[in-house]
């Protein structure tokens, strides 16, 4: 798509929705967004906030769905999770044999997709020589760093 951002994001969200729906036999929808921010600091802050937000949402979702699987209604499960501290949510899961800290990182904080430079063997038809060329490929990272390390990780990819 020649890096047309909105098109790429639209296609990725649609592909994720379709794949998840087919795999689980029920409709699902994923969204994506583009945010134009005026400087690097705000970009890093935004991504750090999204990273923490993903963690909060995952903890809430694990608590909610654990309660739903135990037979709680939508409203009772929602009410039971609402107002609990982070520690109380961890305890609730642990009491039900779920150690949130041992879940895969991508389930707790999401994952990253970004361009990565790779070397590829090639042939130059004009010179008749073999050689290596640099190419940009999309890389999926399921083990993102935390805290300040995550901020440095984001900054490294935007400058």
Question: What do the PLM-derived regions correspond to, one by one?
Answer:
Residues 1-159:
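Regulatory and interdomain segments flanking nucleotide-handling catalytic cores
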